[in-house]
UniProtKB/Swiss-Prot annotation:
SUPFAM superfamilies: Eukaryotic type KH-domain (KH-domain type I) (SSF54791), HD-domain/PDEase-like (SSF109604)
Residues making up the signal peptide according to the UniProt record: none
Keyword set, alphabetical order: Cell membrane, Endonuclease, Hydrolase, Membrane, Nuclease, RNA-binding, Transmembrane, Transmembrane helix
Taxonomic source organism: Staphylococcus saprophyticus subsp. saprophyticus (strain ATCC 15305 / DSM 20229 / NCIMB 8711 / NCTC 7292 / S-41)
Listed name of the protein: Ribonuclease Y
GO MF, one annotated term: RNA endonuclease activity
Principal location: membrane
Pfam families the record matches: HD, KH_1, RNase_Y_N
Length: 519
């Protein structure tokens, strides 16, 4: 770096001399031309200037060289200090490694000593195990000789004994847990159903197979009969309803098992009596008019039912079929009102369980829709209802609810189960349905006779209006297990042989009494 600086300085001097010479020459030439200055003066002046430049450059080079020298010395001192520090750190690491090496050597010695001791102990343990195994084998042979059983046979016998004991304990535990679970489920179900039923207050009107038309006077009976009975025959032929004209004052009785035809006949007869003109031609007109009026009533009844339940987007033809249930009864219970009640109950139950309330109401409303035309189409009302629901593109959940509410198929959703429960609630509620007294008495007698036909039954009592049969059994003949079997057998026979609305509870009572007399 110093040599390069010197070269640069010399080069600068040379360039300066050359430049000075050129400048001097030019000046000299100019002075010669302008002022006539001599060449010696110009050369002397150029030499002086060159000498000054040379001195300045030499001075600058010396100063720069001194600065470079001082910086080099400083860097050298710093590097020497860094090397000394690194050397000290290396010495410290070396000392640490030596100490760690000493510690590892000591640990190796300790581990070798421990391994030696462990080997000695292992040898002692092996010797003891061998001795113990010998004693065990000796004792096993002695036990096998005394008991006459091999080790495997003895183990199997012990396992069988333990299994028998555990099986009994498990059976008791399972029975107890089943009882607790049933009690909990029954309690929750009863609370849910009780809450739901209390929220619904439905009105029911008992229906019959006859209708009565009041007349303004008894002379009207003759006009209804007509000459040679042609008027009454025409009316009966057109409506399919029997007209009973007897000694009942100012009244005509219409008898028929089709409520819609009976309503058409009643409406036509009321209109004929009001009009006063009664002859075959007029009867035909009035019957046609009555049919239209009843159709309107049916349609209005269906629309009113869907409006009350808040069910929308139902096919108009299905709404009309639903309205026909207004004139359909089951055990004296109006089926349309029953369907509305089931819809309300289904919606309430669905709300309690977090299910779709609207869908539950729709399924409840349509569950008995097949009864509207079951006297016109072959098949049970369930099968007819399923076909109607499919025909009018109802939801699969609704179809399954219709199909499963009497147990014909398995329910595939919670809503189907809720509809079946709501149907049973509506039908079994006291006062919802009625039977004739004769059928009622006959059914109760048959229920008691069936229960008393089993061996060990002392007496059977039909209670709760025939919704429960209480069977008293002999404790000497029937034990606890047989009591459960007897209840199931009676239940199965009732289901196979008897027809009844709702459910019948079978209760078997087994009572043991210990009696002693103090003398």
């Amino acid at each position: 770096m110093n040599l390069l600086g010197l070269l640069l300085i010399l080069l600068g001097i040379i360039l300066g001399v050359v430049v000075g010479y050129i400048v001097a020459r030019n000046l000299l030439h100019q002075k010669q031309l302008q002022a006539g200055q001599t060449a010696e003066d110009i050369i002397e002046q150029g030499n002086k200037e060159a000498e000054n430049i040379k001195k300045e450059k030499l001075l600058e080079a010396k100063e720069e060289n001194q600065i470079i020298k001082e910086q080099s010395e400083i860097e050298l001192r710093e590097r020497r200090g860094d090397l000394q520090k690194q050397e000290a750190r290396l010495l410290q690491k070396e000392e640490n490694l030596e100490r760690k090496s000493d510690l590892l050597d000591k640990k190796d010695e300790i581990l070798e000593q421990k391994e030696s001791k462990l080997e000695e102990r292992q040898q002692q343990v092996d010797a003891k195990e061998s001795s113990v195994q010998t004693l065990i084998n000796k004792h096993e042979q002695e036990l096998e000789r005394i008991s006459g059983l091999t080790q495997a046979e003895a183990a199997q016998e012990q396992l069988q004994r333990v299994e028998d004991e555990l099986s009994q304990d498990i059976a008791i535990l399972v029975k107890e847990k089943e009882r607790e679970a049933k009690e909990a489920v029954d309690k929750n179900a009863k609370e849910l159903l009780a809450t739901t039923v209390q929220r619904l207050a439905a009105e029911h009107t008992s229906e019959s197979t006859v209708s009565v038309v009041n007349l303004p006077n008894d002379e009207m009976k003759g006009r209804i009969i007509g000459r040679e009975g042609r008027n009454i025959r025409t009316l009966e032929t057109l409506t399919g309803i029997d007209l009973i004209i007897d000694d009942t004052p100012e009244a005509v009785i219409l008898s028929g098992f089709d409520p819609i035809r009976r309503e058409i006949a009643r409406t036509a007869l009321v209109n004929l009596v009001s009009d006063g003109r009664i002859h075959p031609g007029r009867i035909e007109d009035m019957v046609d008019k009555a049919r239209k009026e009843v159709d309107d009533i049916i349609r209005d009844a269906g629309e009113q039912a869907t409006f009350e339940i808040n069910v929308h987007n139902m096919h108009p033809d299905l709404v009309k079929i639903l309205g026909r249930l207004q004139y359909r009864t089951s055990y004296g219970q109006n089926v349309l009102k029953h369907s509305i009640e089931v819809a309300h109950l289904s919606g309430m139950l669905a709300a309690e369980l977090g299910e779709d309330i609207t869908l539950a109401k729709r399924a409840g409303l349509l569950h008995d829709v097949g009864k509207a035309i079951d006297h016109e189409v072959e098949g049970s009302h369930v099968e007819i209802g399923v076909e109607l629901a499919k025909k009018y593109a109802e939801n699969e959940t609704v179809i399954n609810a219709i199909h499963s509410h009497h147990g014909d198929v398995e329910p595939t959703s919670i809503i189907s189960i809720l509809v079946a429960a709501a149907d049973a609630l509506s039908a079994a509620r006291p006062g919802a349905r009625k039977e004739t007294l004769e059928n009622y008495i006959r059914r109760l007698e048959r229920l008691e006779t069936l229960s008393e036909s089993y061996e060990g039954v002392e007496k059977a009592f039909a209670i709760q209006a025939g919704r429960e049969i209480r069977v008293i059994v002999s404790p000497d003949t029937i034990d606890d297990l047989k009591s459960h079997r007897l209840a199931r057998d009676i239940k199965s026979q009732i289901e196979d042989e008897l027809q009844y609305p709702g459910h019948i509870k079978v209760t078997v009572v087994r009572e043991t009494r210990a009696i002693e007399y103090a003398k």
